[in-house]
Amino acid sequence: MARRTDRAPLLDWAEGPGVSPAPETEQGERWAQGYGAAWERRPAGELTPLPQLEDDHIAAVFVVTFDPRSGNIVEWCRPHDIDLEGVEFKSMASGSHRVQSDFIYFRKGGFFGLACFANMPVESELERGARMKSVGVLSPSYTLLYRYMHFLENQVRHQLEIPGHYTPLEAFYEDKKGVLPVGPQTCQPALHWLPPVHKHLYPEMKITHPAGCMSQFIKFFGEQIFVLWKFALLRKRILIFSPPPVGVVCYRVYCCCCLANVTLPGIGATAPESKPFFYVNVADIQTLDGEGSYVACTTEKIFEQKQDLYDVYVDNQNVKTHREHLQPLLRVNSADKEKYQRLNDQRQLLMYSQEVDGDCGSCEEDLFILFFMEQNNRIFQTLLEVASSQDKTLTAEHARSMGLDPHGDRTFLMDLLEVYGFDLMLVIDNPCCP
C-alpha cells in the first residue's frame, strides 16, 4: 500500500506554472522540508519517493472588504505593486452576504487563489449592520493552497474583530513570498524564492484539505458521475452553477477534473487542454469566451443565458447541454450503471478494510482518482492497440472491453476518436436498423 502523504488531493495531479527550485541553505539542505514526500509506484510495485517540489510559496496576500459606499475593494495587499484587478470580486462571491463564512478557489491570470470569507454582524450604521471581509493568497500553483486554509480562516476572523491589524499577514508574506522576474508578466510567471523569515510571528498552520469531497461528489451526482466523466474526457466546457456557499462547489470542479486523468504517454496531444478555473464571475466572460476547454463554477445565474460560453451547464444535480449532438451523452446507459456499481463496491470494500483491518494507508480520494484513471487508461490502451492493427476497425467487442455500451456510447466513442485524433473506423450496428 502506498504511503499516505499530507499533500492535498486538491488537483495534486496537475501543477500550475513552473516554479524555480528552492535555493540550498549553507548546510546544503532544502529549506521547508518536512511536509512529507510524494510517492511513485513503479511497474514492479516498488515505491520510490518523488523529488520534493519546493512550491509552498505565494505571490501575494491580500484583504478584501465590502464597503457600503464603494462595494468590494482591496483594502490591503503585499506586495504593493502586484496587479490584483478583479480579485475583490473573485474572493467575495456574488451572493456571499447571505452566508456567514465561505472559501473560494479561483484563477487570476497565471496565478491561482484561495480566499476565506466571513460575515460578522455589527451595530455600526455606517456598515449597515454587517462587516464582510475576505483574506486570500495567490500562488503560481494550486496544489498546496489548501495548506493556508486554516491560517486564512483565522485571519479573516481577526480582520473582522480588529480591522487594520496586518502584522500576522505581513509576517506570513515575508516567510512565503516569491520574487517575480523583472519585465512584463506572462500568463505563466516563473517565481524565484527567498528564504523564509519571521515564522514565529504567525500561528502554526494546520493541514486542511478536502477529505471526503469525493464521497460527497459521488453521493450528490450518483450515476450521473459517468455523464460528467464523458464530458470531461471529451474536454468540454463545463460550468457548474450554485448559490453560495461556493467552497463545496469548487471541490466539484476539482472532482470533475479528476474524472479525465490519463497517464498513458502521447494521449491528449491533439485535445484541448482542460483547465480548472474554479470560481468565475461576469468579469471572466471575455476570458472564458477564448477557452476551448475548462471546468468552472459560478454563483451568477446570468451565465445560463450565455450559451456560447459553455457546452455543459450543471445546476444542482441537473446536468444539461444545449448542443444537440451532445444530447445522447446525457442518458445513463447500462454500462454506466455497471461502472457505478463497481465503484460503490470498491468503496464498500475500502470502508470494510479501514474498519476491520485498521487500514489508514488508503483513502476514498485515492480510490476515486485511481478508478477513473484506470478506466481511462483502459479505453485509450484499447484505442492505441486498434490504431496499430492492420484493419484499424473498432467493433462492439472493443467497446465492451473498454467498459462502454456499444450502442449507448456510440456518440461518445465517435467524439472521442475525433477529439484525440484516432483515425479508426467505428463498426457498430445501429440497433434501430434491421
Swiss-Prot record:
Q: Which part of the chain is the cDENN domain?
A: 194-341
Q: Where is this region: Disordered?
A: 1-29
The record's section on InterPro entries has: DENND11/AVL9_GEFs, LCHN/Anr2, Tripartite_DENN
A Pfam family hit: DENND11
Recall the GO molecular function terms of this protein's record.
guanyl-nucleotide exchange factor activity
Q: Where is the dDENN domain?
A: 343-434
In Swiss-Prot or TrEMBL terms, this protein is called DENN domain-containing protein 11
